[in-house]
Amino acid sequence: MVEPISKSTKRETIQGIVRGIRQDIDGYKQLKSLLKRQRELMQSRDNQGLHHHNEHQSRLCHNLMIKAGERRRMLKSLGFEATAGGMRSLIERLPEPVSEQVSMLWDNLISLVKESKQMNESNGKLLVGQQEVINQLLQRDEQPSVDYGDKR
């Protein structure tokens, strides 16, 4: 049987969730900047710079995933589903001035996540396009070429 958590523990947990959302907003702003830089490195074909950049970007993404997991755990500890819907339910149950502020923060975070996903998908398409060009060039070099009846 699960014991109910105290009022002060609930308050601390909610404060932890809000603090985490604020930190994630900063993290996703940083991720958007990194995704923009990643695209620039890909376009300039800076493989060494891209390698170092991607290590940094991967660490940030890993940290964001850990923080999302912590938020899910905190939501569950408060009796809410560990989903965006659970977060909305929590926000609706907060007192009015607080719920409005947390709702704005949450909406901002969701927007940044969506923008980051779109940028990442765009970078993925650029990478696929670059790989296709490289493959076409490699395949062309493997096939014997004939110009005016003479092999090159």
Model-derived features: where do they sit?
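Extended, charge-rich alpha-helical scaffolding segments
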Residues: 2-89
